[in-house]
């Protein structure tokens, strides 16, 4: 921990890029150091979906509020974001929200059903549906996110990660209408209406840029883009329908703030993600991180990549696997320990605590 002046080194390696806002001397900047590949102590640890249903404190709130009510209430956004910080002392907070707030702002109707997941009430079925989607000229409908970030600022002693969904993943929900097993509808658009599909992706990307810039202005310290369904794409499809729009978003951010790109399929697409020069690439659990370092050199950080199912294992096995990954990445100044995807809802808090404590017990 140290006095941190919110100094963010450019993703193009321009070390004099400075963002203001002085943070107190108790601020834990370990994640930000790792995102600059300058961390000389133990790796930072945070976990995707760390503020979720596996926490008893979260489930208690869900008994009082719907998921969307919690996403729309700035005080609840702040409260839920802080739950894993208080429970586990992880090295970063990730904003409590959902990747479907942009489709909600686009008025396609979003609801969440228990044991089903997100449902799009008015899915995209034709070109006219795409043409009707508004451009991001007014972000008033997302003001609750900005206010949630502002509620968090005085209460955090770790970096806050803002996020959005990648255009391809968000479009998948908007076209399929819900989580899909085969993605036939979106593949139909790719092959039969590619230009219309590109129009949709561009609109989502423009909304994503405006939304992420709003989060930057509100005070987040880093960003992550989730491309959860990229693993359904062929290599050429990934280049055309995902990577191009991630690059477009990266260029549209108004400040040199660290950006983590995570996609399912990063064991294949990782070098391509690195080619557009984010601060970090998030890896799924199907690759060996050390080998990815051979093809993704400094100054790009690597984040990941424990199997999420590890958290169902006996506690000694969790410690063993965490220590094996820490040993493998020993001395890597740009390594961030995380899962290869989000925490499952029925995982025990004891398992998560064991993972985090194993990292925190490392020297430094």
UniProtKB/Swiss-Prot annotation:
GO molecular function, one term: uroporphyrinogen decarboxylase activity
Pathway(s) where this gene product acts: Porphyrin-containing compound metabolism; protoporphyrin-IX biosynthesis; coproporphyrinogen-III from 5-aminolevulinate: step 4/4
CC per GO annotation: cytosol
EC number: 4.1.1.37
Residue numbers binding substrate: 49-53, 98, 173, 228, 341
Localization per record: Cytoplasm
Keywords: Cytoplasm, Decarboxylase, Lyase, Porphyrin biosynthesis
Substrates-to-products reaction catalysed: uroporphyrinogen III + 4 H(+) = coproporphyrinogen III + 4 CO2
CDD domains assigned: URO-D
Broad class of the protein's primary localization: cytoplasm
Pfam families xrefs: URO-D
Site positions (Transition state stabilizer): 98
SUBUNIT field: Homodimer.
Role noted for this protein: Catalyzes the decarboxylation of four acetate groups of uroporphyrinogen-III to yield coproporphyrinogen-III.
NCBIfam families, per the entry: hemE
Family: Belongs to the uroporphyrinogen decarboxylase family.
Protein name: Uroporphyrinogen decarboxylase
């Amino acid at each position: 921990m140290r006095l941190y002046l919110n100094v963010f080194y450019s993703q193009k390696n321009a070390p004099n890029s400075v963002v203001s806002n002085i943070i107190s001397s108790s601020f834990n900047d370990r994640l930000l150091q790792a995102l600059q590949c300058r961390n000389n102590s133990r790796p930072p640890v945070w976990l995707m979906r760390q503020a979720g249903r596996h926490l008893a404190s979260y489930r208690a709130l869900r008994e009082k509020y719907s998921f969307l009510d919690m996403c729309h209430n700035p005080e609840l956004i702040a409260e839920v974001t802080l739950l894993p910080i208080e429970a586990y002392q992880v090295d970063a907070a990730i904003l409590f929200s959902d990747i479907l707030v942009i489709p909600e702002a686009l008025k396609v109707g979003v609801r969440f059903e228990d044991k089903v997941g997100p449902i799009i009430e008015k899915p995209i079925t034709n070109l006219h549906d795409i043409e009707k989607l508004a451009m991001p000229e007014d972000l008033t409908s997302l003001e609750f996110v900005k206010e949630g970030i502002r509620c968090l600022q005085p209460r955090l002693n770790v970096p806050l990660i803002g996020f959005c969904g990648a255009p391809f993943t968000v479009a998948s929900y908007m076209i399929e209408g819900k989580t899909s097993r085969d993605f036939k509808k979106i593949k139909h658009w790719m092959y039969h209406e590619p230009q219309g599909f590109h129009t949709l992706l561009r609109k989502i990307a423009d909304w994503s840029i405006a939304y992420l810039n709003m989060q930057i202005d509100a005070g987040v310290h880093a960003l992550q883009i989730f491309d959860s369904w990229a693993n359904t794409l062929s290599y050429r499809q990934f280049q055309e329908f995902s990577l191009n729009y991630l690059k477009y978003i990266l260029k549209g951010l108004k400040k040199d703030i660290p950006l983590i790109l995570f996609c399912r399929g990063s064991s294949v697409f990782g070098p391509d993600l690195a080619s557009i020069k984010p601060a970090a690439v998030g890896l799924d659990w199907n690759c060996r991180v050390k080998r990815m370092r051979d093809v993704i050199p400094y100054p790009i950080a690597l984040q990941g990549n424990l199997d999420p199912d590890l958290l169902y294992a006996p506690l000694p096995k969790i410690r063993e696997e965490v220590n094996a990954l820490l040993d493998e990445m020993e001395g890597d100044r740009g390594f961030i320990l995380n899962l290869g995807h989000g925490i499952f809802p029925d995982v025990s808090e004891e398992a998560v605590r064991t993972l985090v404590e194993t990292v925190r017990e490392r020297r430094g």
